[in-house]
Amino acid sequence: MAALAEEQTEVAVKLEPEGPPTLLPPQAGDGAGEGSGGTPNNGPNGGGGGNVAVAAAAGGDGGTPKPGVAVSAAAPAGAAPVPAAPAEAGAPHDRQTLLAVLQFLRQSNLREAEEALRREARLLEEAVAGSGAPGELDGAGAEAASALLSRVTASVPGSAAPEPPGTGASVTSVFSGSASGPAAPGKVASVAVEDQPDVSAVLSAYNQQGDPTMYEEYYSGLKHFIECSLDCHRAELSQLFYPLFVHMYLELVYNQHENEAKSFFEKFHGDQECYYQDDLRVLSSLTKKEHMKGNETMLDFRTSKFVLRIYRDSYQLLKRHLQEKQNNQIWNIVQEHLYIDIFDGMPRSKQQIDAMVGSLAGEAKREANKSKVFFGLLKEPEIEVPLDDEDEEGENEEGKPKKKKPKKDSIGSKSKKQDPNAPPQNRIPLPELKDSDKLDKIMNMKETTKRVRLGPDCLPSICFYTFLNAYQGLTAVDVTDDSSLIAGGFADSTVRVWSVTPKKLRSVKQASDLSLIDKESDDVLERIMDEKTASELKILYGHSGPVYGASFSPDRNYLLSSSEDGTVRLWSLQTFTCLVGYKGHNYPVWDTQFSPYGYYFVSGGHDRVARLWATDHYQPLRIFAGHLADVNCTRYHPNSNYVATGSADRTVRLWDVLNGNCVRIFTGHKGPIHSLTFSPNGRFLATGATDGRVLLWDIGHGLMVGELKGHTDTVCSLRFSRDGEILASGSMDNTVRLWDAVKAFEDLETDDFTTATGHINLPENSQELLLGTYMTKSTPVVHLHFTRRNLVLAAGAYSPQ
């Protein structure tokens, strides 16, 4: 048929000249049954057709639209509520809805559309021509009418359970155009919609609009019901308060009920948990519909479903309550904006729930932490270690040489047997060891033999590097693995590198001078260095914004820096110049880190994604997308097969480097995450955030296993000792704290029930695990590092109060 207006958008029903109308398929998720995998989509009344009022403004002569004429099929006033049950085929409100649509089509002279719809519904001509009486349908016609309505309802994105009869809810569609003659067959009907680009968007938005004066009553009624429930159900159902509050407030603002929205916010915002106060402050600034456009907080809530894990009996109790109260306003929000992960067994306590909630999108789904993770270490190559002078074979009193066992690399001996939890050696292509790498491993082994075994009775010494007069604003620090170099990123866009050993920093000679050097000499590596350039400090210029991240390569030949200018730069520590600028992030890059094996590195920034790079590729190899806010910190797993990211959405994610999939989502922090570190054996992960807590995670089972309380400000840095006995944490509260990691992880028994349900019981033993607290005068601790002999190096900029 001919289009009603050239500029109008297309409706979802295509009218063919022959046969019944072809409907678009239902949207994904419609019709899902109840189960533990998600939110059941059948409403509290079990489905069925609701009351529908179709308001149409048909154009008159000359194309001038007439005022909207409402053709309502609502139940008569005073009709008794229908009990909650699946609607029977051919129910009166089903027939009335179809008749209303058919009458509108007839008034608009859309004869072919009317005939096609009437044939499929098998309605009698007299019923349509009548004054709105239901008309008689045979059994097949009744089934067709019910099926047709359900299909039309399913085709609307975001459609939820319909309102029960008598509630007066309506779905309104506004049409305009010329009705001067019949439309041509085979065309697509067009609809002009006010203020929205398509009909489905209007319907979806209007479905969420209820009586603005009733929102407070709906929320208060649910709040009273939950508070009067049994203790076992109260803790479970209390999780609904925050997401329902946010979505009801956003609906009021979106539908321009500003006074009601303000009253609703002032009345109930104080009832929310304290760890949501930062989000509520942002939410309170959204007071007009125009404020919602482009607002990140609003987009997060509207585009991602808030995940709640609720005990099955508690969920059934909630569902029965909403059925009895005919509260479809709340039920629609539950369906459209929440993901209910139902579990069996036993309900969780308030403490267990509080330990896991707090993130921007709720808890993690159980399926998110079921993937197999190879957290074991790769087998190290065996390297022969030459004997030191003092270990050389001597002669005993009889003149016979002493018998000495040949030394092997302790690293190799530690991993002689393949760890069953380790990934295949060739799962990720890693760079081959160079001769210089082998020499460095030999030096590392020698240092290991002199390493102090730490414990509660043998705490490490701490050496603190204080940046004085750092008026450029220290923003990032890193130390090389052998503790010979320290780098700092500053707000004035510079990167500064210091030597912390007597050996000064030297640059390679110019090319003209290098051609004169004998390349066969034994000391060629010394000859190529220019002694005239020797100094304790080198300043690297290149960024055009503050430098927020720095990372040395394992071989100490390169340095990475990330900046507010959206780039990651690779610097040569032989020439102290920039080699490559990696451009991929669209916004500031908050952190970057090299792989333990070099070559690869990861970066994360304000654009909410982390990127995996290789030094010889100017484009990222992987993009890790999934966070709902800034990626503040990144960390490579010791086996280089995984990357951990901490975000301002208060979640930690573990990503598989092989395929880019997210294999773990950890929730529990109440503030943005700013520090991460893996245990040396690769099994555990420690995270720190602005809430001052340090959380410990079992990567294999995907569970929280510990909570360390003591810091009063953001935890900026975390490091395990070389053997994993001690965990050091540095904070903005000017303290370094040492924790007993062995005791925190000992007797860790994760049974099948805990693994399946996530019911964790965190011991309140922070004071027992705290081994020492070390105060600085007035210096926030920005970075921590354990030397190869287990000496702690800390760094920060002096900031007098």
Swiss-Prot record:
GO terms for biological process: mRNA transcription by RNA polymerase II; positive regulation of DNA-templated transcription; positive regulation of transcription initiation by RNA polymerase II; regulation of DNA repair; regulation of transcription by RNA polymerase II; RNA polymerase II preinitiation complex assembly. GO terms for molecular function: DNA binding; promoter-specific chromatin binding. PROSITE patterns: LISH, WD_REPEATS_1, WD_REPEATS_2, WD_REPEATS_REGION. Residues 1-69, 156-176, 385-438 are annotated as: Disordered. InterPro entries: G-protein_beta_WD-40_rep, LisH, TFIID_NTD2, TFIID_NTD2_sf, WD40/YVTN_repeat-like_dom_sf, WD40_repeat_CS, WD40_repeat_dom_sf, WD40_rpt. It is found in: Nucleus. SMART domains: WD40. Residues 30-51 have a biased composition (Gly residues). GO terms for cellular component: nucleus; transcription factor TFIID complex; transcription factor TFTC complex. The keyword Lipid biosynthesis does not apply. WD repeats lie at residues 469-508, 542-581, 584-625, 626-667, 668-707, 710-749. Residues 385-396 have a biased composition (Acidic residues). Keywords: Nucleus, Repeat, Transcription, Transcription regulation, WD repeat. Residues 93-125 form the LisH domain. Residues 408-419 have a biased composition (Basic and acidic residues). Transmembrane segments: none annotated. Distinct domains of TAF5/TAFII100 are required for functional interaction with transcription factor TFIIFB (RAP30) and incorporation into the TFIID complex. The TFIID basal transcription factor complex plays a major role in the initiation of RNA polymerase II (Pol II)-dependent transcription. TFIID recognizes and binds promoters with or without a TATA box via its subunit TBP, a TATA-box-binding protein, and promotes assembly of the pre-initiation complex (PIC). The TFIID complex consists of TBP and TBP-associated factors (TAFs), including TAF1, TAF2, TAF3, TAF4, TAF5, TAF6, TAF7, TAF8, TAF9, TAF10, TAF11, TAF12 and TAF13. The TFIID complex structure can be divided into 3 modules TFIID-A, TFIID-B, and TFIID-C. Belongs to the WD repeat TAF5 family. PANTHER family: TRANSCRIPTION INITIATION FACTOR TFIID (PTHR19879), TRANSCRIPTION INITIATION FACTOR TFIID SUBUNIT 5 (PTHR19879:SF4). Homodimer. Component of the TFIID basal transcription factor complex, composed of TATA-box-binding protein TBP, and a number of TBP-associated factors (TAFs), including TAF1, TAF2, TAF3, TAF4, TAF5, TAF6, TAF7, TAF8, TAF9, TAF10, TAF11, TAF12 and TAF13. The TFIID complex structure can be divided into 3 modules TFIID-A, TFIID-B, and TFIID-C. TAF5 forms the TFIID-A module together with TAF3 and TBP, and in TFIID-B with TAF8. Component of the TFTC-HAT complex, at least composed of TAF5L, TAF6L, TADA3L, SUPT3H/SPT3, TAF2, TAF4, TAF5, GCN5L2/GCN5, TAF10 and TRRAP. This is Transcription initiation factor TFIID subunit 5. It comes from Mus musculus.
